[in-house]
């Protein structure tokens, strides 16, 4: 591809390599889209269709004329966008090769107009430079491919849906413009039929069904794009309809950019529709705001690379499109998508220099019921802490049209199936029944919607008639938002008891759900989870279901069940794998998905940043060192994605030596940046909180004080009694053994404490020190039994050392920069008193378990002289009493509550 054809599409990221997040400017987005299509089509041609000579078979399926038509159509859009060569050949030449070999007799409807409109780009039929080199037979074949006039009889006989009038109108209008149609009355008649169809509903929403059952879906919006070439003939109705389509998708847009997430033909096509609507919005000047529509198109475009491999769509791999778009139409779907994106790029070219708002700005709170007509047909649209979600109440009885919540990546259902999810399923005889079709009524209030049906119906059809219920009764569903979750209550009252009744909730492997069921009295129920990973029938448009949560009731006519579903919080931590982070997260269990760091030079590039709900920052210096510009880029990206940040402020500045060797003060700007950005900051003491705020500012964050947890879960099982530890360490007996453990710190005055021991007159004291700096030596004194440089040891060794001690010493400089030390929590867990300096952290954390001894050698010597057994016993009892305060289970529960609150705060 030439440099003029393909421009850098944007920064490379882990979520869509090598394309990255698309550019925000509409002009650059147009180039990005066109480049993406050119790259994909080139790859497809090079691998499977050199020179435009399509194969006759693709992965076991015959290649039909629809592929020829769609490839020519896509190339026509690229040509209009300025692409003259592709895969080393002129676009004109490839299109000519395709049309010369097309099977005209088997090309019809959608593919007829695509051939005709493509040919029209080169001018009228006579003297058309594209067709001139073809022989008479080939030209006749192309003319036949453009002609679907015989289908008009099927439309007259109502064998085809009424909206096929638009398809045939495009066919005949293009033929008339080519000069292949003599009687314009045919076009006029078809255009009038199109107007009749579009004007049928005063709300401008298309019911795409044959029987008028209220099948509102992706085509409810798409029909207005499809009829754009007819807009001049349709009149003002068309622009009103486009405005309605845009208003609908402004409400139904999913977090992944899918325009309409229920019904048929969504998934990859749902993303493409959003891009198309963004282009149409700019071209025609309708929609809420141009910059917001560019942002919507950009959001959808960012996911497009994930729908393709080697130029071919992945919509059939590990997921499924609708049945009529099965693997036998894989190439056609591929080119259908490319054609839509190429068209959108051309439209965006006309409206330059509109810059998208940040993606997070699209995430404004929403709670709205969109009515499709004067019946109860509607869709409930919500956007909040649980993401964007829709619940449709429409016609058709296949799985995709039932009133299950849809939020791609979180709430998905099987494609084109009789597997009904989130709704009651009752079996009578061999037939299953559920709530299908438009409800009798739908009521909406703040944060909730209620729907009622007159019973349950059997069958799972795309276009069946809506007859009386097979199981009469009254069935009500009540949906309401609850934080990040969704609560659904079902009241079922049937005239006849089925032999079985159940509910099913599918779950993706990468998006665990916390599911709770409850039944109100009799009958009793049974909950279960079933692994279905790899079972084809459980595939959705976007993924495959990993497991199904199911709840069955004993046979009954009447039932009331409550369903509570909350997506597991996806947490990325800058300390992933560190023992502090492990100790914090493990007690949270299934409430979180624990993900590695996803930002900065140390990031795990396999982590999808768009699949993160919250970022937990620990030590900023280990995210991007002292590179302030990189820290700023990370902060901006978090903000653009709307990912909140919780920061545990372990320090005021990094420990020395810092990761880069720079002095700790060099990181002040980095710490201030994160203090301004963070949504919550965790401190381990109130005094630490006050010092942090005084130095770095409060920002807009919640400042919360939570204790430092102890690490006893890592070493408790290795503890032994004191005498055993004494023997294993080769220590002589002592009445009072004081330990110094933990890594050296500038503020940790180990030498002063040891000098104090050497200066005191007590003979019953023994000190064991494993905390010296490498360049530090201890006084020569027989009471200092061990004086070793710090080395990280395993859990068993650490437990052995604690077991040998009667107290731990904490000789920290009260005026230093440290905010906390985890060894204090270990002292509490081990039931050991702390011999403490005047450092404020020690007194607040240890309480009565702290024995003041100062930090200078003279202070330590004097304090040791005064220390008696009663003091130590009282401090030991106080340490044991404080264990509940430092248990990670409690710290984790309080931290998890903070996580949830921070996510909710984003939507306050």
Briefly describe each language-model feature range.
Residues 58-279:
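Aromatic-lined, polymer-binding surfaces characteristic
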Residues 255, 259-514, 519-526, 534-540:
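Extended polysaccharide-engagement surfaces of secreted carbohydrate-active enzymes
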Residues 808-809, 828-829, 833-836:
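Short hydrophobic beta-strand element within catalytic cores of glycosyltransferases
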């Amino acid at each position: 591809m030439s440099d003029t054809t393909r421009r850098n599409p944007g920064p490379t990221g882990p979520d869509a390599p090598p394309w990255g997040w698309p550019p925000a400017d509409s002009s650059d987005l147009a180039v990005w889209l066109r480049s993406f299509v050119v790259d994909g089509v080139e790859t497809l041609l090079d691998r499977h269709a050199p020179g435009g000579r399509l194969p006759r078979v693709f992965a076991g399926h015959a290649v039909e004329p629809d592929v020829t038509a769609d490839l020519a159509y896509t190339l026509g859009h690229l040509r209009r966008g300025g692409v003259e060569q592709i895969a080393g050949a002129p676009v004109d030449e490839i299109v000519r090769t395709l049309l010369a070999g097309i099977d005209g007799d088997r090309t019809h409807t959608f593919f007829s107009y695509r051939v005709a409109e493509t040919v029209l780009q080169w001018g009228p039929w006579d003297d058309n430079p594209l067709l001139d080199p073809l022989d008479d037979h080939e030209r006749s074949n192309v003319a036949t491919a453009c002609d679907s006039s015989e289908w008009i009889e099927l439309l007259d006989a109502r064998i085809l849906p009424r909206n096929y009038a638009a398809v045939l109108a495009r066919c005949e209008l293009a033929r008339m413009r080519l000069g292949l149609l003599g009687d314009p009355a045919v076009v006029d008649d078809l255009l009038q039929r199109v107007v009749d169809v579009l004007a049928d509903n005063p709300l401008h929403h298309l019911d795409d069904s044959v029987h008028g059952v209220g099948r509102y879906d992706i085509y409810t919006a798409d029909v207005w794009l499809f009829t754009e070439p007819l807009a001049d003939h349709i009149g003002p109705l068309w622009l009103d309809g486009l405005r309605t389509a845009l208003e609908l998708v402004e409400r139904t847009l999913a977090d992944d950019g899918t325009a309409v997430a229920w019904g048929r033909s969504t998934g990859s096509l749902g993303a493409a529709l959003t891009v198309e609507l963004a282009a149409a919005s700019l071209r025609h000047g309708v929609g809420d705001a141009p910059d917001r529509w560019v942002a919507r198109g950009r959001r959808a475009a960012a996911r497009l690379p994930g729908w393709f491999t080697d130029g071919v769509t992945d919509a059939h791999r590990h997921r499924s499109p609708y049945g009529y778009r099965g693997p036998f139409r894989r190439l056609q779907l591929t080119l259908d998508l490319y054609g839509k994106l190429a068209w959108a790029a051309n439209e965006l070219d006309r409206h330059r220099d509109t810059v998208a708002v940040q993606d997070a700005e699209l995430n404004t709170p929403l709670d709205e019921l969109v009515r499709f007509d004067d019946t109860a047909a509607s869709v409930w649209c919500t956007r909040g802490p649980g993401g964007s979600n829709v619940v449709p109440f429409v016609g058709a009885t296949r799985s995709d049209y039932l009133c299950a919540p849809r939020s791609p990546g979180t709430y998905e259902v099987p494609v084109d199936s009789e597997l009904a999810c989130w709704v009651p399923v009752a079996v009578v005889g061999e037939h299953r029944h559920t709530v299908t079709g438009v409800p009798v009524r739908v009521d909406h209030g703040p944060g909730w919607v209620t729907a009622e049906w007159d019973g349950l119906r059997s069958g799972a059809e795309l276009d069946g008639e809506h007859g009386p219920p097979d199981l009469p009764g009254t069935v009500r569903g009540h949906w309401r938002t609850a934080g990040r979750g969704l609560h659904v209550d079902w009241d079922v009252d049937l005239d006849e008891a089925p032999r079985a009744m159940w509910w099913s909730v599918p779950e993706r492997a990468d998006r665990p759900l916390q599911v709770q069921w409850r039944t109100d009295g009799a009958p009793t129920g049974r909950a279960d989870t079933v692994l279905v990973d790899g079972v084809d029938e459980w595939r959705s448009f976007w993924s495959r279901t990993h497991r199904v949560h199911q709840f069955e009731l004993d046979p009954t006519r009447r039932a009331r069940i409550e369903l509570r579903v909350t997506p597991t919080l996806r947490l990325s931590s800058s300390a992933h794998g560190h023992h502090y982070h492990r100790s914090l997260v493990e007690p949270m269990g299934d409430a979180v998905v624990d993900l590695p760091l996803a930002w900065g030079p140390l990031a795990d590039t396999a982590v999808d940043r768009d699949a993160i709900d919250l970022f937990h920052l620990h030590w900023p210096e280990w995210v991007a060192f002292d590179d302030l510009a990189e820290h700023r880029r990370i902060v901006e990206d978090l903000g653009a994605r709307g990912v909140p940040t919780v920061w545990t402020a372990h320090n005021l500045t990094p420990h020395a030596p810092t990761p880069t060797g720079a002095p700790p003060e060099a990181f002040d700007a980095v710490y201030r940046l994160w203090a301004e950005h963070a949504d919550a900051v965790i401190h381990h003491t109130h005094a630490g909180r006050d010092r942090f705020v005084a130095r770095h500012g409060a920002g807009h964050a919640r400042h919360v004080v939570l204790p430092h947890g102890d690490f006893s879960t890592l070493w408790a099982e290795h503890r032994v009694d004191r005498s055993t530890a004494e023997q294993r360490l080769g220590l002589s007996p002592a009445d009072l053994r004081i330990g110094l453990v933990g890594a050296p710190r500038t503020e940790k005055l180990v030498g002063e404490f040891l000098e104090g021991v050497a200066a005191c007159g007590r003979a019953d004291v023994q000190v064991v020190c494993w905390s010296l700096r490498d360049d530090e030596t201890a006084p020569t004194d027989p009471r200092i039994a061990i004086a070793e440089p710090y080395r990280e040891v395993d859990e068993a060794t650490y437990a052995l050392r604690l077991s040998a001690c009667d107290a731990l010493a904490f000789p920290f400089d009260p005026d230093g920069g440290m905010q906390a030390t985890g060894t204090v929590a270990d002292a509490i867990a081990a039931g050991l008193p702390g011999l403490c300096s005047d450092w404020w952290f020690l007194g607040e954390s240890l309480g009565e378990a702290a024995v003041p001894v100062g930090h200078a050698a003279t202070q330590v010597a004097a304090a040791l002289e005064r220390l008696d057994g009663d003091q130590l016993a009282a401090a030991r009892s106080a340490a044991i009493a404080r264990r509940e305060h430092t248990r990670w289970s409690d710290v984790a529960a309080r931290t998890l509550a903070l996580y949830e609150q921070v996510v909710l705060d984003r939507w306050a």
